[in-house]
Amino acid sequence: ECRYWLGGCSAGQTCCKHLVCSRRHGWCVWDGTFS
């Protein structure tokens, strides 16, 4: 199960497509990609 946008995340969790875990904030943010 992937983590949705602004969902809490840690290094061991995978965010959903086009999202990346923000180390600074500790939640999933958009990684800037569309494809």
UniProtKB/Swiss-Prot annotation:
Pfam families cross-referenced by the UniProt entry: Toxin_12
Tissues in which the protein is found: Expressed by the venom gland.
Post-translational modifications reported in the UniProt record: An unnatural amidation at Ser-35 provokes a 14-fold increased toxin ability to inhibit Nav1.2/SCN2A and a ~2-fold decreased toxin ability to inhibit both Nav1.5/SCN5A and Nav1.6/SCN8A.
Site (Pharmacophore for Nav1.7/SCN9A): L6, L19, W27, V29, W30, D31
UniProt GO molecular function: calcium channel inhibitor activity; potassium channel regulator activity; sodium channel regulator activity; toxin activity
Main location as per UniProt: secreted
Effect of L6A: Decrease in ability to inhibit Nav1.7/SCN9A
Compartments (UniProt record): Secreted
Effect the entry attributes to changing D31A: Decrease in ability to inhibit Nav1.2/SCN2A and Nav1.7/SCN9A
GO cellular component: extracellular region
Substitution effect: Q13A: Reduced ability to inhibit nociceptor cation channel TRPA1
Stated consequence of mutating W27A: Decrease in ability to inhibit Nav1.2/SCN2A and Nav1.7/SCN9A
Domain text: The presence of a 'disulfide through disulfide knot' structurally defines this protein as a knottin.
Purpose of the protein: Ion channel impairing toxin that inhibits voltage-gated calcium channel Cav3.1/CACNA1G (IC(50)=53 nM), voltage-gated potassium channels Kv2.1/KCNB1 (IC(50)=411 nM), all sodium channels tested (Nav1.2/SCN2A (IC(50)=60-104 nM), Nav1.5/SCN5A (IC(50)=76-358 nM), Nav1.6/SCN8A (IC(50)=21-133 nM), Nav1.7/SCN9A (IC(50)=51-95 nM), and Nav1.8/SCN10A) and the nociceptor cation channel TRPA1 (IC(50)=389 nM). Acts as a potent and selective blocker of voltage-gated calcium channel Cav3.1/CACNA1G, but not of Cav3.2/CACNA1H, and Cav3.3/CACNA1I.
UniProt similarity note: Belongs to the neurotoxin 10 (Hwtx-1) family. 54 (ProTx-1) subfamily.
Identification of the protein by name: Beta/omega-theraphotoxin-Tp1a
Species of provenance: Thrixopelma pruriens
